Amino acid sequence: GFIGYGAVFEADGVVVDNYSVRSNNGQAMFWTNPSVNAQVNALAGYDLVILQYGLNIMQTGVHNYTNYARQIEKMVVYVQQCFPTAAVLVLGVSDRSVKTDTGFEPMDAIPYMLDYQRGAAENTGAAFWPTCDAMRSLGGMEQFVANGWAGKDYTHINYAGGRRVAWSLVDAI
């Protein structure tokens, strides 16, 4: 039978396709068919593929993400094979805070995860952008929550927060 991945109704200009699967660590992309991806790429002509994973994998006190970095490298290579004319950008994890006796503070795993993500991007020739740094330049997760730009879980930004981060990314590009 027919399996549809989307429909195209856009005019010329910048078009963003979001292939989002909640609570996905990136492994779902390997379930996609490379030949179908190549056909989609032939029709859409992607210039850039952005990968953003890792936020829910981090744990307080965990500083070694070697195995995860290998998975990131596999994901980047897979995307490069499916979309050979597109650049690949790995977004580093966003800011995330944890509750302490004195309030909320940034999760200690963030700099370690960022280092592993940055290394995986470098090892595969992908670009890297640290989302966390952009959020912290806007006040960090505590300010995002206070402004209503993130959930009270101090982990996930919402549409309003995403808009601010997106403009930071546009400025960086």
What is the predicted role of each segment?
Residues 71-78, 116, 120:
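Short, conserved SAM-binding segment of the class I
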Residues 12-15, 44-49, 83-88, 123-127:
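Loop/turn elements at helix/coil->beta-strand transitions in domains of secreted/extracellular proteins
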Residues 1-70, 156:
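Conserved SGNH/GDSL esterase-like catalytic core that processes O-acyl groups on lipids
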Residues 22, 46-52, 80-84, 121, ...:
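Short C-terminal domain-edge/linker segments immediately following a structured domain
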Residues 50-57, 77-114, 130:
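Active-site segments of SGNH/GDSL-like serine hydrolases
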Residues 66-74, 110-113:
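Charged helix-capping and loop-helix junction motifs
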